[in-house]
Amino acid sequence: MRQSGLSIQIAELDTGNVIFEKNSQQAETIASVTKMFSTAAALHFLGPEYKFKTTLWRQGDVREGQLFGSLLVVGGGDPNISGRFYNDDFNYIFDRWAEGLKQSGITRVAGDLILNAAFFDDQFRNPEWPTGQEAKWYQAPISALSYNDNVVLVEIKPGARPGQRAIAEIEPANQVVRAVCSAKTGGYRGRPHVAVMRPVGSDFVTVSGVVPSRGSWFSTPIAIDDAVGFFGSSLKTRLQNDGLPLGGQLVERPIKPDNNWVLVATTESDLLPTLAVINKRSQGYYAEQVFKTLAAEKLGKGTWDNALSIQKQFLSGIGLDPTRYDLHDGSGLSPQNRVAAADVVAFLRAMDRHPYGAAWKATLAVGGDEESTLRHRFREAEMEGRVVGKTGTIAGVSTLAGYVTADSGKVYVFAILLNRVGESSGHAYQDRLIRTLVKNG
C-alpha cells in the first residue's frame, strides 16, 4: 500500500500507547466514518431517551362524518416514517393516522392538508455532495417531514403478451413522482434488461428496455426531489385509499397549532435504534436527518451550519481540539470531511469514557453481523465479535475505524484511512492489518 493518501494509527484503548502508525497526523477524507462523530454528538446532547415526534392535528367542526376544516402535520425530523421498523409496511403510520381520524367520526375532510416542515431549513441537499447524483438513494433530500427514506421504488410488470408495453408503477403511491414506461415485454425466458432513471430536476422516472413475460421486478430505490410534497401527496393518497378523501389542497405553511386545533395522533420513534441504522447500515439519509434534528433542538433551526457548530461544541466538551476535525456534513458524503487517524483514535478513546459510551458503541457495526456493513468481513469463528466500528466508502476512499479485541484479551482502538484506493484493495489491506493485530496484539 503506497504511503500517499494513507493515515493509520493503532493504540491500546486503556493507555493510549501507540503500537503502529503511518502518517497518523495526516488528515485524509474519512467518508462514512464521519457518521461516528455526528451520531456521538447527537447522543451526547439529545440523550438516549430522546424521541423524534411528528404530530397530526385537525381543525373545524365534524358534521355527518365530514370535517369542515383542515388537517395539519407538524414535522420533527423523524427519519423513521417508513416501513423499516414496521415489517416493511411503509403505510403503517399513515394507516394509524387514518384510524385516529375515523375514531373522531371523520370519513371525509373538506379542507386542506397543511404541512409544517419549518423544523429544518429548505436546503435539502448539502452543496458539497457530488453533482449529478441527486436521483441516487444516498442523496435523498433532507426535510423535517420525510417519508420512506425520501425514495420510491418502481415495480415493473410484463404486458399481456410479448411485444406489448410493460407496466411500471411507483411505490409508495403518490401524485408527485410519475413513471413513464417505454419498456417492452419479452419472452418467458431470460432476464430483465431495464434502465430506470430520474433525470435531475424531474419528477418523472423513465423505464426502458425489455422485461420477461413472467413475474415482476423492482428497481433500486430512487431519490425524490420534493420531500414535503412527496410526504403530503403520499399521505393524501393513503387517506383516500383508507376511505378518507381530502377535498382541499396540499399546502406547505409553518403553522403552529393553537387552541383551535385538536391533536389526532402523535408518532414517536427512539433515538438509539435510529443511530444503529446509521452506524450499522451506514444510512446517510438517517445521519443527516439526525444531524439537522440536533441543530434544531439545540439552536432552533435544523441547518448544516448549526449542526456543525454544535458538533464543534461536542468535540471540545469531550476534551478534543475541534480545529483538528474538518467536518462538513453528518453522513460523510462530502469529500471534504478530513481527519487524521490520530484524531479519530483520540475520539474513539474519549467515547469509551463517555457516560453514553457503551450505548453509542452498541450502535456500531460488528464483524460478520448480517445487519451491518461488516457482514462480509471478519466472519470467521475466531474473529466473531472482535471488530466493532464504522466503515466508510466513497469514490477512491476506503476507511475503517473502531475497536478490536486481540487474542490476548487486550482492546485496541484503530483508524485505517485510505484515499486514492479501490474498495476491494482497501478492504483487503484493512482486514490483513486487523487480523494481524488480533493474533499478535
Q: Where would I find each of the regions flagged by the language model?
A:
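Residue-level preference for non-acidic, small/hydrophobic
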Residues: 16, 35-42, 113, 145, ...
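A short glycine/serine-rich beta->alpha loop
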Residues: 22-28, 221-222, 331-334
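Small-residue-rich helix-loop
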Residues: 19-21, 92, 281, 291-441
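Beta-lactamase-like hydrolase cores
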Residues: 1-14, 18-27, 53, 100-105
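Short active-site loop at a secondary-structure junction
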Residues: 21-41
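Conserved serine DD-peptidase/penicillin-binding transpeptidase domain
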Residues: 45-322, 439-440
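Short glycine-rich loop/turn motifs
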Residues: 5-8, 275, 287, 312, ...
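A generic structural motif
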Residues: 26, 79, 418-422
